Amino acid sequence: MNIIVSQEIASVCPTFVGAAVEAQVVNTPYSEALWEEIHMLEERFRQELTTESLKDLPGIAATRRVYKACGKDPSRYRPASEQLIRRMLQGKELYQIDTLVDLVNLASIAFGYSIGGFDADKFVGDTLTLGVGREGEPYEGIGRGMLNIAGLPVYRDALGGVGTPTSDHERTKMTLATTHLVVLINGYDGDEGRVAANARFIQDLLRKYAKSDGGTVTLYHFPS
């Protein structure tokens, strides 16, 4: 899998660094041990954060800055990591989908980065390009219907958009049948060490909960 960071992204976030975790996996409907980890993190965050202070977490603050630079309101189109942590802090249960989705959500919450998880066999072509959404560009967000992605950072394959920091696309979403996983970590704060640590954390989760060897990690930035 080749990943290209476009000049569009570099112009609003020259220090962007991403990480791709690619692995063979086995998905399951539910993992009790994984949810024990999620609940432990929920308890800690409820003691340490508020719905206002979470906006200052480096990964979230940097993503919000990029949204504003691209002309998008980050309070209307919240980054996924902010959505998840905000929901926890409001005392609401996180959505339980399946082990892979839940695992990616945990990784996003733990580090504050917006992370996309994809069924890599659904990509068209062997290259993803990170650019900025255009007016009128069709995009069906998972569980959200048609989403206006103009001004949102977006990964595109040969057919079109597959992932934004707000919502990934229905076409390439993970399911119980997914065996070839790609997870993309978006480090708009430019902290390569923390992005790499997030990738290693995901590898550990895959080993524990998805019958995987953890796969491989590739870091990417501009110029690609």
In which residue ranges do the predicted regions lie?
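Charge-biased, low-complexity intrinsically disordered regions
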Residues: M1-S224
